[in-house]
Amino acid sequence: MEPHTFEQDGVTYEVRFTREAEAWIARIRRAGEATAQIVAFPHERGYDSDDVRASLIAGCEAAVPNLPWAAVTRH
């Protein structure tokens, strides 16, 4: 699946998706940073199978505010 980029509160995030045996895995990272947060969407119940991409993107965008990000530093 193609990567997705979105912005929240002035911060740009990049998401890469991979399909694994038991779930779709989303690796969400702030643009330009090496560290990623991993979110899993289990098959059969973690997303809408009629529109997988849109469902995974919506889940990632909803998860971002609740993930344990390091404080943003601006120089």
Descriptions of predicted regions:
Residues T35-H75:
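Mixed-charge, Lys/Arg-enriched low-complexity segments
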Residues F6, V11, R30, R45-D48, ...:
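Exposed, low-complexity/repetitive linear segments and helix-based recognition motifs
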Residues M1-A21:
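Short N-terminal "domain-start" leader segments
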Residues E14-P42:
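A short, structured beta-strand/loop element
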